[in-house]
Amino acid sequence: MLENEQWEGFEGRIWKEEINVRDFIQKNYKPYDGDESFLADPTDATNKLWGRLQELQKEERAKGGVLDMETEVVSGLTAYGPGYIDESLKEFERVVGLQTDKPLKRAFMPYGGIKMAEQSCENYGYTPNPELHKIFTEYHKTHNQGVFDAYTPEMRKARSSHIITGLPDTYGRGRIVGDYRRVALYGIDYLMEEKAKDLNNCGDGTMTDEVIRLREEITEQHRALGEMKKMAASYGYDISKPAKNAKEAVQWLYFGYLSAIKTQNGAAMSIGRVSTFLDIYIQRDLDNGVLTEEEAQELIDHLTMKCRMVKFARITSYNELFSGDPSWVTIALGGIGVDGRHMVTKNDYRFLHTLENMGPSPEPNLTVLYSSALPENFKKYAAKISVDTSSIQYENDDAMKPEWGDDYSICCCVSATQTGKEMQFFGARANLAKCLLYAINGGIDEKSGKQVGPEYKGITSEYLDYDEVIEKYERMSDWLAGLYVNTLNLIQYMHDKYYYEAAEMALIDTDVRRTFATGIAGFSHVIDSLSAIKYAKVKTIRNEAGIVTDYEIEGDFPRYGNDDDRADEIGIYVLKSFLDKIKKRHTYRNSEPTTSLLTITSNVVYGKYTGNMPDGREAWTPLSPGASPSYGAEQNGLLASLNSVAKIPYEWALDGISNTQTINPTALGNDKEEQVDKLVQVLDGYFDQGPHHLNVNIFGVEKLKDAMEHPEKEEYANFTIRVSGYAVKFIDLTREQQLDVISRTCHAEI
């Protein structure tokens, strides 16, 4: 059993005999039932640094969204020496480390695709060194080139028609959360020793493809751990041994995360479930009188500041999919342990308090793991932060814990993953709304007129018959599921081969569980369209080529989002039907297939390629995001809408079910206290029904309109809203996306 002087005062045995951070947490954390009265205001150091960072953010916005871009150096763990927010203020930085050599400067990361890396520079007026182009086209193959070398013509057609899109074939797949806590608890040397043991135990027998690959991967992981030590040493820190106090624990953990964001540009780069872990160190130092509450808050403020600075170079088409420059630096708070003890600590309050000390911000993506059994004080404080900032999201801990245990992280927007035990193969989403139109038109794309899907016989009747449409839809969605999975298998294979996440995987168990994450877009429109066909009369309108391009609806029909089982049960069918088709396919590396109802802001892009729908949605307009009902469909208030979404079984969409709702403050009450109490009641009632997720926005439409027209107002500089699975500064959205947000239902009554 290991013993380190840095562990003095810590309880437990198992975590000393094996890498087991969960056991360490369970044996040492102290649940907190009190209120927020203990919290401290920002220190002078925090105010100085945050003030400087805000100045840099204003410069960044004035320059079109990018402050600086690397054009000479390929990013890597040791590609840069130390960097600081401001050299003249570095004595105030309690947590150090930048992705590059300057704050908010975006790294050059060509391993996902050299073309993407070059375009992301050129889009903002930067010219990368031509030698880099030569290296990554002639001498070093990239993930993107590998994928496109292997794509079939059918895959290319589906990709360009946007029936499948957002694929991670030009950028890092992300959604892999290293257990960055391990760096603080064990130190790098011990982690390297354990990886060396894993290597020695791998391949004592037949050298199969899988064994050979695993030995290479473990070696890369071991090497990455060594590089982490060098990177930390450049800042004057020795992370070879465990952290001895709270300051080191925060710093060591951040160095682990910094290693990930220096080497990968994944769409989602979560930092994981770190709050309770860090609270153990902070509480020990508080008890020993070597740390004050002001200093504890300062550490969390500065870690949060670093999370707010995470930036990646992106191309225009990427920004259309994931608007507002998100990084999904997701931090999970709260939750209930499997032993029944809640896991709320003072540190969960401290992380939420950063939104008061430094104002609202989209990053980090603060996520409350919610249960009605959480302490009332904490629920009220989280609700207060929602009312004040609209910056946090809620996920149902009671729904996730049976599947993922009590030490899971949120690896992107809403998807859970067991920390340090598993990884996820991210796979964007398939457009089921467009799939329904393909079913009606026999695989012909309604926008291009090209044959993209299989040449199944389309529907020839003037009025749509429900049973016939279902039969056609079943065949077309089966084709789509097969093509989708094959495309993702190819992408994940090439990503492992050319853009392997060694730094992140070094902090995950070698015997890793893998999930295969698919996704669904256009969910509510498929429901409402099938409902219209079933309960009303839908007439087809064809162009001169005989393609159905529009529909006339005669009569009324139930819409998803009104707590009407007739529509809601169609939604359950749509989800289960597609998941079943995904599950019957072979998935790469024996990964476990899951799916999600989650679109991010790609609902706007998807909509541009999706024609008129039988539910009345107009062609080329945004699809409704995630699992949220169609715009304007909700006629019975917030609770009815929540009840509809709550009927979707989480076990059939383990990758996540995103629900975004906007509530006018007056719908919750006339004063802050009443609004907070009412929001807690809404959250308790909603999550007790078993749904997965809720984004909560508390503001009126007029504020959105004013922010769109007057983005220069100081009050809107950090105006943050929740969209599908993440938060974003409203003024960072394109006008088209701002209009999309404004068009969504804003509930004036509960």
Give, region by region, the residue ranges found by the protein language model.
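Conserved catalytic cores of very large enzyme subunits
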Residues: 2-750
